Amino acid sequence: MSKETRDAAAEGRPSYKDTLNLLQTGFGMRANAVKREPELQAFWSDNGIDGQLGLQNDGPTFTLHDGPPYANGALHMGHALNKVLKDVINKYQVLKGRRVRYVPGWDCHGLPIELKVLQSMDQEQRKALTPIKLRKKAAAYARKQVDGQMKGFQRWGIWADWEQPYLTLQKEYEAAQIKVFGEMVLKGHIYRGLKPVHWSPSSRTALAEAELEYPDGHTSPSVYVAFPAMEVPTPLRDALKAEGLELPTETDALRQALQVAIWTTTPWTLPANLAVSVNERLDYALVDDGSGRMLVVAADLIESLSTTLERPLKHRATVKGALLAGLIYRHPLLDRTSPVVIGGEYITTESGTGLVHTAPGHGVDDFHTGQKHGLPVLCPVDEAGTLTAEAGPFAGLNVLKDANPGIIEALEQAGALLKQEAYSHRYPYDWRTKKPTIFRATEQWFASVEGFRQDALDAIDQVQWTPASGRNRIEAMVKERGDWCISRQRTWGVPIPVFYHHSNGEVLLNADTLSHIETLIASHGADVWWEKDETDLLPPAYANQADQWRKGTDTMDVWFDSGSSWAAVSSQRESLSYPADLYLEGSDQHRGWFQSSLLTSVAVNGHAPYKRVLTHGFALDEKGRKMSKSLGNVVDPMVIIEGGKNQKQEPPYGADVLRLWVSSVDYSADVPIGAGILRQLADVYRKVRNTSRYLLGNLHDFNPASDAIAVADLPLLDRWMLQRTAEVMHEITEAFESYEFFRFFQLLQNFCVTDLSNFYLDIAKDRLYVSAPTDQRRRSCQTVMALIIERLAGFIAPVLCHMAEDIWQNLPYPVQETSVFQRGWPTIPSDWRNDTLSAPVQQLRDLRAAVNKVLEDCRGRQELGASLEAAVRIDARSPELQAALSWLNDNGDPDVDGLRDWLLVSQLQLGGEPWAEVLSNHEDELALIEVSRARGTKCERCWHYEGDVGQHPDHAHICGRCVGVLERRTHQLV
């Protein structure tokens, strides 16, 4: 028994609760998502909705090609942002009738997995580990990680071809990758060379740009060093003589009198110094440092160097950099002389001395300058970062540990150290081991970007980039990038299928060998490279030469793996397209997957592998900080869904709230997430759910087939609601088409809360609850509610997929489609659109808001409770409001469109004399509003205050309108 019924019984009054049309629905007020969402996912699976629906559509193919996450570690908020964005887009395209097959992928090779395998073994097991055993264990580990991540993605409501994902360790994938490599070889884009590359001593392998990170706070020991001159070219002597400066001719005197000053942040590279480079266009000065010697420095840096070196520098002469070329200096630590040479535009006066220490084996600019001047590529550092015998007395020192202090001490003892100071700057670290990297010249395999750089830039122009800044970013990277080092000195990867001649190191890599290896890998997988010897790996034409060749041991950069996915997946699998319609990943992939995919596709086929690229930012905490265990600010997506250990502090919100978060953020920038944000999102989710529940609950006795009212016969309020729904649907469609999902979020929230709950449904309560069941005023509202709930379910389906399906399964009348996704994207009938309704209704909504403000003022003073306790007088001031009131009076349905009903007050007076007794009033440009207490008695059924309550003997406590309803109700329910 309800409180109202108990109170009525206690006072001897009849209860009319059972005569009202109350909510009836199985759609719960609470989502109970932990239980209900998996049930809905099982429903999709059992009915082939998630797997087959997209393939049954007959519209154009839509391919969102999945960038493969790494098969290692737990899922995090970055995964959630990425995968949910993709799923929202795919579900929208399915609803739009496009043919959609989403193939999820995983990146399965590489060092992290190899290290995980090694870390799980003791020393003895590692000693017994062969390459093929390591590969088998790595593959098993990767597959286990894939299984775990896949379950997580599925729990988020992600639809994909989970039965046939692509893994970069699959033999068909590896074969396609070999084919891409082979075609690049045959087109002349692949070569082997000795060049400085990013080298990780901690991983003992070369790294690509995309495998580097630049943490804050790195400090290097920088040194200013003087190299004594041994020989001065005649043109330089003559120029200095013309300025009144004559240099000694005797060598010992010259080396004391003239020295070239350099600056470096890598003292450990000084044993590899083979030149000092200058910019031929810069002015260089000879300055006296007060110790009986002259230093050569950039003229523009004299003042700053004087401060840095803490000594006055007296200017003696100035010459152009071009004249310094050919000066011979002596290495201050080794028995070696080297030249001053002309470098490039990388030599500036922004820092240092304007003269650059040049070690061709340890820097890209140094290497190119060395090549230009015929310098050897000296690299006295081994794979572990230890200086070799070529470093002379420094052999055995580690470049990242004791080499710098040892060399700095030697410089000081030699009198060559001008200054030492700590220098903070960006420095590359191995993204996996988090240890510093170095530049080290080694024999590596490269993809020569020069051969197709312009084609790649042209291809970038043909792609749509979202946001547009992405185009500038990748264009700058491709313009400036050097050749791509694609070889790695690791076991767990796809082999570079090359053979080397035993006697002379000649390389065997041609169409015949490539085709043979591709066929072997297609049949057996890349393990075949380690399982078989040269006799089987070489094609038949070379079988009798097998003893002359040895197979290579390098594997391919994992970015070449994932960068070949267009060849292994998009262009091979059924129901996919190449170029793909969309690539969608984090903004860091401009230098990663977007770029590696672009380069391989352009190199082989001359065009980009994608038509559009969309990038998102990173998930941060609510304070805008990166998530880290040390800060304790990591948000776990599975805790959002299932709840944490303390479910009061970390309640289970379900996957739809996680998905709603993704739709709420401007993903083009970094996006925050945390407990406070989740509470706000859960509140929005509840409002959408409660609005949906209210719509469903009022349709329990309604069947559109027999009970619907024609749109043309609907009251103004109902026709406006359809017009407003049409406007919102149009804007939501635009938001999905332009991938601006935050607009969808805002539109949905405003539609459910402002348009429906606070306005239309608030006004509709009287006719829904109080009317006789089949009264036209009720049926017209139910007609609108049915039309809206079906479309609401449809347009939230890409984001709130579980709620949308739950709504559909709780529709209380029969529909043709088993699932909301089978209905397709909601359509708007043309007769819903009536733009003439918008302006007058907006005026009336503004009036309603103004009246509510005055009523709230009365409530605040406890002079009124419910709005039905009020009587209101309105004197319209603005011409627009006056016109709207006339429009409503002339065109409105008296049973629905009375202004009194729209304002939810018991009495209303328009114009006339001011009231003598008012509780509150307000006047502005819109209207004068007066509020008084309603006259009459409260009807116990509809709660309106009416003058005829008590005039009906059989129903002494209700108004005449309700008496009439009860009579009709009795007749209708017979």
UniProtKB/Swiss-Prot annotation:
Gene source species: Parasynechococcus marenigrum (strain WH8102)
Q: What is its EC number?
A: 6.1.1.5
Q: Name one GO biological process term.
A: isoleucyl-tRNA aminoacylation
Gene designation per UniProt: ileS
> What name has this protein been given in UniProt?
Isoleucine--tRNA ligase
Q: What is its main location?
A: cytoplasm
Which GO terms fall under molecular function for this chain's record? aminoacyl-tRNA deacylase activity; ATP binding; isoleucine-tRNA ligase activity; tRNA binding; zinc ion binding
This protein's assembly is summarised as: Monomer.
- Residues bound to Zn(2+) are C939, C942, C959, C962
Which reaction is the catalytic activity of this chain? tRNA(Ile) + L-isoleucine + ATP = L-isoleucyl-tRNA(Ile) + AMP + diphosphate
Give the domain note: IleRS has two distinct active sites: one for aminoacylation and one for editing. The misactivated valine is translocated from the active site to the editing site, which sterically excludes the correctly activated isoleucine. The single editing site contains two valyl binding pockets, one specific for each substrate (Val-AMP or Val-tRNA(Ile)).
User: What PROSITE patterns does the entry give?
Assistant: AA_TRNA_LIGASE_I
'HIGH' region (motif): residue ranges: 69-79
Taxonomy, top ranks, is: Bacteria, Bacillati, Cyanobacteriota, Cyanophyceae, Synechococcales
Q: May I have one GO cellular component term?
A: cytoplasm
Task: Please tell me which stretches of this chain the record labels as motif 'KMSKS' region.
Answer: 626-630
Requisite cofactors:
Zn(2+)
Similarity remark: Belongs to the class-I aminoacyl-tRNA synthetase family. IleS type 1 subfamily.
